[in-house]
From Swiss-Prot:
Any Gene Ontology biological process: malate metabolic process
Catalytic function, reaction form: (S)-malate + NAD(+) = pyruvate + CO2 + NADH
A Pfam family hit: Malic_M
Cofactor binding: number and manner: Divalent metal cations. Prefers magnesium or manganese.
Gene field: dme
Catalytic site: K107 (proton acceptor)
Protein name: NAD-dependent malic enzyme
EC number from the UniProt entry: 1.1.1.39
The organism of origin for this protein: Rhizobium meliloti (strain 1021) (Ensifer meliloti)
Function comment: Required for symbiotic nitrogen fixation. Plays a key role in the conversion of malate to acetyl-CoA for efficient tricarboxylic acid cycle function in nitrogen-fixating bacteria.
């Protein structure tokens, strides 16, 4: 790396055209988009001896004796090769293997981002079919699967066919089959909305390259009839007897007809499949198509007809493009990472038609479900509902892997190509959930306990918020809690319809209407009794109880009409804490509230306290917070190991802060003699046992601390934010400690999954108070 590059910022400059921004993005802070990271420690001589000579001989011999154990001892079962010769790079054509490398690196990071699959991009100087087959097939010992990319037709057909015959691992040409799978899912859903049978549907295609023919082949597998398919390319209709630009794959769709141009064939068509060139489908041609036509205009960057032009010509049309700025984007990332995930996990020898069909039906089915909040954000906050503008899911819908990978793995087993069939699909789905929702594994004990107390009522102060509405549906579906939502009924009902959610107010969950609840006067009286001597006059109390939903929720918990409160999705933390403090109050003996935050990173779970409440807690407050935090951590099925962190390392400094932490340690040991705790210590000593042993060999803390206790709010909150951002960690919390009754104040950045997590924790707290 050039030394000058080190100083370059990661941020892409906002000014300049897209090309300049892309060049900057690819060059800084280090060239390219990939790196290799070790998955085993290499910190000492012993590690080196195990990773390499002499220890590495043991797995080598095990694999020699039983080749299937390569999946146990190497990364092969999670490693895919993205292979290209650069002869048909999207939008660029035949630019050669070296120039195609940025595209292949991009494909690699998509595999990793969306499915956790490791990839080597391999660009080969192999212009002929024979050369490609020889080179790629020789890679079989290294990889668990091969993704062919950007190889021109018709060579790509022959390369894939021969490799599939020769290799015992999946070989998948994504340009063909990825596009075909998504197109097939869109066609299934589009025809269903139009009330049409695929066996009777007339399909007109513009384009006869690899992707177009793969789409048509898969539609035939779904039930379309070849006699109803009319294929056009640059030479016009593919008809029987035509000689120009014909090949064996195209010939199967040759029609016995005098039609020659698109205008001859388009009349009465139910589906237009475009994988050709911009502007091919004219408005006057679209006007001649059947009722409720499905338009797949997939030419990039400009489709065969622009959606707004198509809508003007045919308001009843359903339109898919390859562009992200229009609904129904046909983007291969919808499927290829998840198909490979399922294929790799069951040790599939190939990706067959049954597996592709399973993926089609999984994608089509997901579009009929309620979209996730992540998918909604991908649509600029407008939540799509299954219909003409939402035939296929967003590529960012996190549930894709949860639907596609198990379906593919199951189809592989049923069709006899899985070498390691998945025996327990519930456990497999749980594993995938942990990849999608990194909180899944850590939260599992909490959810298990919550389901045993699912009758418990959780009241949500911001009941009109989309994230809360989505969380309420998840809680009801999973049997975790009985939600009570504070909000205006008409707003809640409108938003439930907008977001496509099935839950029904006053049937599935209770609604507390702040504008007209019959308990209003009782709530006002109770509130005034609590705060009347805190400067709140009766008139103000009436206004607050009508307008402050956190106050309403806290009163409901105080009165026993709810078991736990969730608030803070909107507004400042301090305001919500004031209301909770005034109404619910602190648990007996608790000196002050405090907040516990959980970060889940690649290295595991780490808890931080106090991250939100006390600016400069006393030694007594720190000690009490440590014990409360340790008790809370045990709810996760985790044994707490606490480190009281400081700028001082086991007495190295005599500052007021260091003395406070030393005093807190003695108090913690008196309050909780069984708790594994030590301090005061540096942050790196808390994490690294090696460093800690150097300065304090007889430390009472073993291994890596999972609870970091800070001397003040600045240190805790700043560390939390820095670590969260630098490690791309998932934040669970903040968890409010010390309240008399279960109540948690979230942050405005929380996701619906975060709301679900905290609601489940609140249910457990209400059933098993400390």
């Amino acid at each position: 790396m050039n030394t000058g590059d080190k100083a370059k910022s990661q941020a892409v400059p906002a000014s300049g055209d897209i090309d300049q921004q892309a060049l900057f993005f690819h060059r800084y802070p280090r060239p390219g988009k990939l790196e290799i990271q070790p998955t085993k420690p290499l910190g000492n001589q012993r590690d080196l001896a195990l990773a390499y000579s002499p220890g590495v001989a043991a797995p080598c011999l095990a694999i020699k004796d039983n080749p299937e154990t390569a999946a146990d001892f190497t990364a092969r079962a999670n490693l895919v090769a993205v292979v290209s010769n650069g002869t048909a790079v999207l939008g660029l054509g035949n630019i050669g293997p070296l120039a195609s490398k940025p595209v292949m690196e991009g494909k690699a990071v998509l595999f990793k981002k969306f499915a956790g699959i490791d990839v080597f991009d391999i660009e080969i100087d192999a212009p002929t079919v024979d050369r490609m087959v020889d080179v790629i097939s020789a890679l079989e010992p290294t990889f668990g699967g091969i993704n062919l990319e950007d190889i021109k037709a018709p060579e790509c057909f022959e390369v894939e066919r021969r490799l599939r015959e020769k290799m015992e691992i999946p070989v998948f040409h994504d340009d063909q089959h990825g596009t075909a799978i998504i197109v097939a899912a869109a066609v299934l859903n589009g025809l269903e909305l139009a009330g049409k049978d695929i066996a009777e549907a007339k399909i007109v295609a513009s384009g006869a390259g690899a992707a177009a023919l793969a789409c048509l082949n898969l539609l035939v597998t779904l039930g379309a009839r070849r006699e109803n398919i009319w294929v056009h390319d640059i030479e016009g209709l593919v008809y029987k007897g035509r000689e120009a630009l014909m090949d064996e794959w195209k010939a199967v769709y040759a029609q016995e007809s005098d039609n020659r141009v698109l205008a001859d064939s388009i009349g009465g068509a139910d589906v237009f499949l475009g994988l050709s060139a911009a502007g091919v489908l004219k408005p006057e041609l679209l006007a001649r198509m059947a009722e409720k036509p499905l338009i797949m205009a997939l030419a990039n960057p400009t489709p065969e007809i622009m959606p707004e032009v198509a809508r003007a010509a045919r308001p009843d049309a359903m339109i898919c493009t390859g562009r992200s700025d229009f609904p129904n984007q046909v983007n291969n990332v919808l499927c290829f990472p998840h198909i490979f995930r399922g294929a790799l996990d069951c040790g599939a020898r190939t990706i067959n038609e049954e597996m592709k069909m399973a993926a089609v039906r999984a994608i089509a089915g997901l579009a009929r479900e309620e979209p996730s909040d992540v998918a909604a954000r991908a649509y600029s906050g407008e939540t799509p509902v299954f219909g003409p503008d939402y035939l296929i899911p967003s590529p960012f819908d996190q549930r894709l892997i949860l639907r596609i990978a198990p379906a593919v793995a199951k189809a592989a087993a049923e069709s006899g190509v899985a070498t390691r069939p998945i025996q327990d699909f519930d456990a497999y789905l749980d594993k995938l959930n942990r990849f999608v929702f990194r909180s899944g594994f850590i939260m599992k004990p909490v959810f298990a306990a919550a389901k045993n107390a699912a009758k418990n009522r959780v009241i949500f102060a911001e009941g009109e918020d989309e994230r809360v509405l989505r969380a309420a549906q998840v809680l009801l579906e999973e049997g975790t809690a009985k939600p009570i939502l504070i909000g205006r009924p008409q707003i809640i009902e409108t938003r439930l319809r907008r977001y496509g959610l099935r839950i029904r107010p006053d049937v599935d969950f209770e609604v507390v209407n702040p504008e007209g609840d019959p308990r209003y006067r009782d709530y006002v009286d109770d509130y005034f009794a609590l705060v009347g001597r805190l400067g709140v006059i009766p008139e103000a109390a009436r206004t607050i109880v009508r307008t402050n939903t956190t106050v309403i929720g806290a009163l409901a918990v105080k009165r026993g009409e709810a078991d736990a409160l969730i608030c803070g999705v909107e507004g400042r933390y301090s305001r919500h804490l004031r209301d909770v403090s005034q109404i619910i109050g602190k648990r007996s003996g608790v000196l002050d509230f405090s907040a516990l935050s959980l970060l889940i990173s690649q290295r595991g779970a780490t808890f931080f306290t106090d991250t939100y409440v006390s600016f400069s807690p006393s030694a007594e407050e720190i000690a009490q917070t440590t014990v409360m935090a340790a008790n809370e951590i045990r709810r996760f099925g985790i044994t707490p190991r606490a480190a009281l962190v400081s700028h001082s390392n086991f007495g190295s400094r005599d500052s007021e802060s260091a003395f406070k932490m030393r005093t807190a340690l003695q108090l913690v040991r008196e309050l909780a003699p069984d708790l594994e705790v030590d301090g005061e210590m540096h942050g790196d000593s808390a994490i690294s046992e090696v460093l800690r042993q150097r300065v304090m060999p007889d430390s009472t803390l073993n291994g890596e601390a999972n609870l970091l206790v800070f001397p003040n709010l600045d240190a805790a909150n700043i560390t939390l934010g820095v670590v969260k951002t630098m490690t791309d960690s998932l934040h669970v919390g903040p968890i409010l400690l010390g309240s008399a009754l279960p109540a948690h104040i979230l942050s405005p950045s929380v996701t619906s999954r975060g709301v679900v997590n905290m609601a489940a924790l609140a249910v457990v707290e209400s059933s098993h108070p400390v």
